[in-house]
Amino acid sequence: MDDRAELDTTGIVDRAVSAGSHTILAPPHGRGRPSLRNRVALALLTLVNWIVPKKRDKFVLHGIPLCEDGILAVADELFVRGLSSIVLVADHQDATRASAMFCSPAVFVGKRSIAALWHYLTARYIVVSHGLFGDPRPPPWQCVVNLWHGEPTAKTIGRYIGRSRINVTTAPVLSHVGQAYRCTEFGLHPKQVPILGAPRNDRMLTADHAEVRKALLGADADVPTLLWLPTYRSVVNGTATWIDAAVRFPGVPYDLADLRRIDDWLYSNSARIVVKRHPLEADTVNYQFRAIAFLEHTDLERVNETTYTSLAAFDGLITDASSVWTDYLLLDKPIIFAFPDIDDYRASRGLNVEPYEHLVPGPFVKSADEFIQSLDRFLRNRDEFAEARQLARRRFHRFCDAGSTARLLDEILPGRTRFPERTRP
């Protein structure tokens, strides 16, 4: 990271303040407008939501994927404060899976049921990682918290890609940089975007990383291993297809020939890479490697772990436009940015922080040769970006502790004390 490449967010903040809750930046491209039927349904839901009385201290949670780390952290903190939660899930099968992952007591309700809608309408507090029921505008007496699932330091979202304003009460972020972008992405006033940290990071910082490493790597637990978390390029949802880059890759942004070269080098140098594809990624790698393994969400669930409890179990991170690298700064471990299609991605999807190549706190590589060279430096313990990571951590994090969830609930539940005898499960 170049010290001279400072982020100037003043203009963004000024526009956010002056526009109030109607912040607008011209998006580079649009994603389409909801149908008339959906708009009418949303208007009716909004009206009913303003009429139905809310139950004090009633929390409804919803995360994607099923056991999203931020939602799990909130459920645990609610338990510490003597509160329970209702968790919306897809179906009975998901309810069974979730019951094994949620350490704190919760009631699981199918999201498509009348009961789920009634819980939503009667809840004083709604906490989500994405949208829910079309994001109707909540009344002042209902608090809707959108944790989101990453800091806006990489790919564009929300209004930048033509989406409408996100109707929430609170959307916590990590820093002033995140606050500036979140205001414009979601169309929120800065007062709605408090700098509190991210609940998902509490789970990353408090997990038993040695035990998680043993559970995930087994006999290879003593072998140098990096975790590769690429963002998605293609999403297929029913009949809809969303493409963020012109070239389709097999789950990671390199073709099979390059992956085989990287795999051969890793095997020859007694190192490993574990790839966890993005949950939305439609493409997969159909090849058996010797030193590259693939980790699915179900593999984590099998050992009762999640993405964030597993992060520190690895020796370093490989990523591209995934905002996970911002969270990973709290661990102060090496990060490799493998982004061969950045020009294509920049033109198609767009990046928030530019020039991205010069601002990221780690080696930025495109070709397989550059990738292998960065792996070689990693194995030789040539950490040339330690100072850059420290600078990035100061820039992108106000808090570096595991107290983000507590700060969030202090914000929305003023005066609600914690019970000393109740520790997090």
Task: Give the label of every model feature segment.
Residues D69-L83, R200-F289, V365, A406, ...:
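Conserved catalytic-core segment of nucleotide-activated headgroup transferases in glycan assembly
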Residues D2-H29, P363-P425:
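C-terminal amphipathic helix plus adjacent low-complexity
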Residues Y125-W148, P152, R302-R349:
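A donor-sugar binding/catalytic signature common to diverse glycosyltransferases
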Residues D2-H119, G415-P425:
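N-terminal pre-catalytic "stem/leader" segment of glycosyltransferase-like enzymes
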Residues D57-L205:
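Active-site and donor-binding regions of nucleotide-sugar-utilizing enzymes
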Residues A26-T46, A154-I157, I166-G251, P279, ...:
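A nucleotide-sugar donor-handling region in carbohydrate enzymes
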Residues V109-A123, P279-T326:
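Donor nucleotide-activated moiety binding/catalytic core segment of transferases
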Residues R290-D299, S323-H397:
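Catalytic binding pocket for nucleotide-activated donors in carbohydrate/polymer assembly enzymes
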